[in-house]
């Protein structure tokens, strides 16, 4: 009895064990049922030794496995993986022409000081109100930027010129950027504002001049090309109409350059008959268009081309350029003077044509 008690005490010294572990190892189960008030339990030493683990760590593992197996509980395994916390961008975005952008704007130190000084002067409590005020005051400049952008898209040549002007404007702004001032704190605020306005006015004037020059040049080129195309189409489709236009272009300067020695008004009689003869007589056109068939009517020394018509009753002497042609592009009477002199000493029915160049 004493030995069992000592063994029990030795077991208590090793640790406190639950009662269910000893019930299975006891030899006298019936004694416990018949004598419930007998607290001194008898257990076989062999079973006790086999039931008690050797160390506390082994006992803990043994206890946990037995309890789970006996009661049927399953504890979920705790995962050692730590989920990464994703930061949410709570700032609202807006849709622009260049895509989605944040509503927040980061300002440099100098611009921020000027901005808040202006906001304090205006008495606004929100930055959006200050920006709204600035946009309203700069509507004219914004319209100029929009117009310049449209012109750049329409005309590439003007776009290059406008780009140079804008670069010069940016350089001037950068040069003035070092001399920037805080609104309300600079003593020369009014003077600097006047200088900036004068510079902007000069730049606007320069832009308008370049715009006018480019538009005029393009218009002149377009008109010239249209005239050339019209003449080519008329010459190809209706050769007779083109020859009539050429003759009218040649004879009009001839009419305007008549000089009379007499005071009488003989304009109608003076050029009417030569024009009719010029249109009707094939010999005159042959001599004028084919210099190789002129024969005796051409004088190489004096550059005289003589056209003879015995049926003509007019008495006059006519001098025309030698290189008379039917070119559309060149004016045969350019830098040349035409003279028509009436002289009764010349025989009737003779027309004298001579070159006369003015140096």
From Swiss-Prot:
Expression by tissue: Axillary shoot and floral meristems.
Renumbered residue ranges of the record's region Disordered: 157-179
GO (cellular component) term, any one: nucleus
GO BP: flower development
RNA-binding in keyword set: no
InterPro entries: CYC/TB1_R_domain (IPR017888), TF_TCP_subgr (IPR017887), Transcription_factor_TCP (IPR005333)
Family matches, as PROSITE patterns: R, TCP
Primary location: nucleus
One of the Pfam families matching this protein, by short name: TCP
Compartments where located: Nucleus
Function of the protein: Involved in petal morphogenesis.
Subunit structure comment from the entry: Interacts with SPL.
Protein name: Transcription factor TCP1
Taxonomic source organism: Arabidopsis thaliana (Mouse-ear cress)
């Amino acid at each position: 009895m004493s030995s069992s008690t000592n063994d029990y005490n030795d077991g208590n010294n090793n640790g406190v064990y639950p009662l269910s572990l000893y019930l299975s190892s006891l030899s006298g189960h019936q004694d416990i049922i018949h004598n419930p008030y007998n607290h001194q339990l008898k257990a076989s030493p062999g079973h006790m030794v086999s039931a008690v683990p050797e160390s506390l760590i082994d006992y803990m593992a043994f206890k946990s496995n037995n309890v789970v197996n006996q009661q049927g509980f399953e504890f979920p395994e705790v995962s050692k993986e730590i989920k990464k916390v994703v930061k949410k961008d709570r700032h609202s975005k807006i849709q622009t022409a260049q895509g989605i952008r944040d509503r927040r704007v980061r300002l440099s130190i100098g611009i921020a000081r000027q901005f808040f000084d202006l906001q304090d002067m205006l008495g606004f409590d929100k930055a959006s109100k200050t920006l709204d005020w600035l946009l309203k005051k700069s509507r004219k400049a914004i319209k100029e930027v929009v117009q310049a952008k449209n012109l750049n898209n329409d005309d590439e040549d003007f776009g290059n010129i406008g780009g140079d002007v804008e670069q010069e404007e940016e350089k001037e702004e950068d040069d003035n950027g070092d001399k920037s001032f805080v609104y309300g704190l600079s003593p020369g605020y009014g003077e600097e504002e006047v200088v900036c306005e004068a510079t902007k006015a000069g730049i606007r004037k320069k832009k308008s001049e370049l715009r006018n020059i480019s538009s005029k040049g393009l218009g002149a080129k377009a008109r010239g090309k249209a005239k050339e195309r019209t003449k080519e189409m008329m010459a190809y489709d209706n050769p007779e109409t083109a020859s009539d236009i050429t003759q009218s272009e040649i004879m009009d300067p001839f009419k305007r350059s008549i000089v009379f020695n007499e005071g009488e008004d003989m304009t109608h009689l003076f050029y009417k008959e030569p024009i009719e003869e010029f249109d009707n007589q094939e010999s005159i056109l042959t001599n004028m268009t084919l210099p190789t068939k002129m024969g005796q009517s051409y004088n190489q020394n004096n550059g005289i081309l003589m056209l003879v018509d015995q049926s003509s009753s007019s008495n006059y002497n006519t001098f025309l350029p030698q290189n008379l042609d039917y070119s559309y592009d060149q004016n045969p009477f350019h830098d040349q003077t035409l003279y028509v002199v009436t002289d009764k000493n010349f025989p009737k029915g003779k027309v004298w044509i001579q070159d006369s160049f003015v140096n």
